[in-house]
Amino acid sequence: MGKLFGTDGVRGVANKELTGELAYKLGRAGGYYLTRDYKGGKKPVVLIGKDTRISGDMLEAGLVAGLTSAGIDVIKLGIIPTPGVSFLTSSLDVQGGVMISASHNPIADNGIKFFNQKGYKLTDEMEDEIENLIFNKLETIPYPTHEKIGVVDSAPEYYHKYVDYLKETVDSDFSGLKIVVDCANGAAYKVAPEVLKKLRADVMVINGSSDGHKINVNCGSTNPEILRQKVIDEKADLGIAHDGDADRVIMVDERGQVVDGDKIMAICALDMMERGVLNKNTLVTTPYSNLALKEIMEEKGGQVVITKNGDRYVLKEMLENGYNLGGEKSGHIIFLDYNNTGDGVLTALQVVNIVKRTGHKLSELAAVLKPWPQRLANIKVKYKQKLKTSELIKQEISKAEQLLGTEGRVFVRASGTEPVIRLMLEGKDEKRLLELEKKLGSIIEEELN
């Protein structure tokens, strides 16, 4: 990866690392890259969506200036989930899409990610080409004049097309189900409640503000505590928690217990296998998924393929090998039959559909997965790049792996979007995991600070 793009687009503190000027350059270079082979009679068109962060307007203005200066027309979608941009990009006659969001990150952060004409996130190689344009060839991009300059249109109503499509992905109506939805004060604030209501669910919304000052603050998929209590207090059938841009989902059963991405994947994969619609009886996951998921899939006659961490790598594996379900423990789940990226709202609908169709409570469905004990730590460091070269850390990881043997594993990686090292330990002996977490965490902290 280059200097700008991380594992999920360009991220940084808005107006510090991610400025209006950089947004302009990304608009020019990214727009030119996406449309340079366009041969249509009209000007090329790119969609822009955003989450609720207050910095979204500033970055949108920079992107619009960059895109239009490269001769590209822009349609502004307003506040819409990331997967909504992916869906609309693939279904409308446009040449690309851009989403302004930092997903589950803090309010001060923001990000920019691109989608190609088919609604797929760009590959590492494509992003490297855009970086090369920005750093070395920005002035070679043409500056059209007169009527060839791009123009801007606003179409916030296009989100209805996305809502209507989501509704068509399920075959039940949800009447009789009481559902609490935590929109994380983010991009799902309209879409998630609206589609559930159209499916006749009894919907209660929490954290549904769009003012941009509270996105992800003590709410959403990374902080489900308020949702858990609300589900219990309201005697709801289940709860749904999205993150800031609604590309992920975590659920809560009727008892207030969290149903994470692994359990959601288990529920959906086994249901799809039973109905004969899980391609090659295969689920694609990442190293963070619990080994119990592999265990249950194999027990039921399926298999799990593990790829690099990050939903783009899950998608790559799915596209290359014809799989149609994959995702991450965090709740990024891709149903390739329906959308080309992780979609939190769509995923929630598939699970609720299974609840309705089978008549089982969510707790009963989730009980199929009995996770091995796991320890997760996010260790803040100054020099995460040194992880690859530290011999001491490598030695300690090797010792931990030998200690756990076949009944556990160790996974350590540098975050692609934050200054942290992610440490995961998994095994059947929880006491041993805790001891190893303390020891490894301490060594990583000392070595990389």
Curated annotation (Swiss-Prot):
Catalytic residues (positions): 103
Positions bound to Mg(2+): 103, 243, 245, 247
Class of this enzyme: isomerase
Annotated keywords: Isomerase, Magnesium, Metal-binding, Phosphoprotein
GO CC annotations on file: cytosol
Cofactor notes: Binds 1 Mg(2+) ion per subunit.
Modification after translation, per record: Activated by phosphorylation.
Segment forming the signal sequence: none
Example GO molecular function: phosphoglucosamine mutase activity
Record keyword Magnesium present: yes
Database matches in SUPFAM superfamilies: Phosphoglucomutase, C-terminal domain, Phosphoglucomutase, first 3 domains
Requisite cofactors: Mg(2+)
Entry EC no(s): 5.4.2.10
InterPro entries linked: A-D-PHexomutase_a/b/a-I (IPR005844), A-D-PHexomutase_a/b/a-I/II/III (IPR016055), A-D-PHexomutase_a/b/a-II (IPR005845), A-D-PHexomutase_a/b/a-III (IPR005846), A-D-PHexomutase_C (IPR005843), A-D-PHexomutase_C_sf (IPR036900), A-D-PHexomutase_CS (IPR016066), Alpha-D-phosphohexomutase_SF (IPR005841)
Biological-process GO terms, alphabetical: carbohydrate metabolic process; peptidoglycan biosynthetic process; UDP-N-acetylglucosamine biosynthetic process
Residues with the Phosphoserine modification: 103
Catalyzed reactions: alpha-D-glucosamine 1-phosphate = D-glucosamine 6-phosphate
Pfam families: PGM_PMM_I, PGM_PMM_II, PGM_PMM_III, PGM_PMM_IV
Entries under NCBIfam families matching the protein: glmM (TIGR01455), PRK10887.1 (NF008139)
Role played: Catalyzes the conversion of glucosamine-6-phosphate to glucosamine-1-phosphate.
Family: Belongs to the phosphohexose mutase family.
The protein, known as: Phosphoglucosamine mutase
Encoding gene (name): glmM
